[in-house]
């Protein structure tokens, strides 16, 4: 019986609406879209590209010419880039035709690198060191599970990164055979449509410091009981701000 009453204001609104303003819609589309730069070309590698020193990708799209295998665990042979200790990868777009994205064998810097469609993981931080891994700018989307997998020790800083439609932005390895204390500092993140922003193992002393904005992200920081038994899955302990998960709730909307 209330339908006519609801319909009348809508008709009046339509009758007196202002003319269509395309600039308004363009602004909304730009805000909601994934801000990946335009590609300057494409490169397909038959094997992983090893990087020592600095590799500037010139904003070309890089891939391996293969179909994503989903969440089936790959290895170094499936990566697009493998960065040696201390290497820098910048100004590159990782295409959808790959499995393992980028691997770091030690400390590394990832600057203005974009993943169009994440397969198994976008970025895997490996090795046994305790250095610093820096992710500056860039972004990733369409990750069924993890974007950044932190297997090594040390510190990860993630600055001004955009992530959309994801399982986890960052996950400290929950069941690696060798475990470490890991820290992650995230600032200026723009996250939307995700399950959890961060996952850490607080029983190993992991900490996460987080700032930025998040829209439609179910959990910001999740604590797990990590294990060094690769045959077991880590147990979830809880989520929300704590001594290990350092942020102010709620994060602002993007």
Swiss-Prot record:
InterPro entries: Pectate_lyase_PlyH/PlyE-like (IPR004898), Pectin_lyas_fold (IPR012334), Pectin_lyase_fold/virulence (IPR011050). It comes from Neosartorya fischeri (strain ATCC 1020 / DSM 3700 / CBS 544.65 / FGSC A1164 / JCM 1740 / NRRL 181 / WB 181). Keywords: Calcium, Carbohydrate metabolism, Cell wall biogenesis/degradation, Glycoprotein, Lyase, Polysaccharide degradation, Secreted, Signal. Belongs to the polysaccharide lyase 3 family. Glycans are attached at residue 175. Its EC number is 4.2.2.2. GO terms for biological process: cell wall organization; pectin catabolic process. It catalyses: Eliminative cleavage of (1->4)-alpha-D-galacturonan to give oligosaccharides with 4-deoxy-alpha-D-galact-4-enuronosyl groups at their non-reducing ends. One of its GO terms (cellular component) is extracellular region. Its cofactor is Ca(2+). This is Probable pectate lyase E.
């Amino acid at each position: 019986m209330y339908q006519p009453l609801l319909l009348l204001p809508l008709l009046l609104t339509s009758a007196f609406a202002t003319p269509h303003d395309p600039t308004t819609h363009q602004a909304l589309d730009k805000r909601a879209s994934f801000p990946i730069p335009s590609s300057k070309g494409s490169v397909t590698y038959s094997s992983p590209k090893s990087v020592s020193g600095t590799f500037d990708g010139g904003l070309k799209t890089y891939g391996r010419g293969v179909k994503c295998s989903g969440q089936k665990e790959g290895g170094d042979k499936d990566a697009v880039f493998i960065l040696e200790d201390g290497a820098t990868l910048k100004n590159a777009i990782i295409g959808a035709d790959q499995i393992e994205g980028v691997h770091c064998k030690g400390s590394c810097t990832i600057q203005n690198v974009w993943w169009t469609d994440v397969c198994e993981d976008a970025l895997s931080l490996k090795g046994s060191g305790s250095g610093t891994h820096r992710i500056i700018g860039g972004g990733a989307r369409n990750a069924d599970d993890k974007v950044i997998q932190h297997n090594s020790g040390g510190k990860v800083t993630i600055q001004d990164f955009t992530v959309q439609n994801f399982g986890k932005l960052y996950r400290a390895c929950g069941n690696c055979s060798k475990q470490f204390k890991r820290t992650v500092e995230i600032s200026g993140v723009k996250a939307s449509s995700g399950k959890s922003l961060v996952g850490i193992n607080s029983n190993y002393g992991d900490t996460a410091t987080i700032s930025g904005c998040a829209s439609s992200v179910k959990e910001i920081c999740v604590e797990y009981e990590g294990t060094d038994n690769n045959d077991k899955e880590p147990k979830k302990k809880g989520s929300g701000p704590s001594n290990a998960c350092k942020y102010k709730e709620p994060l602002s909307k993007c």
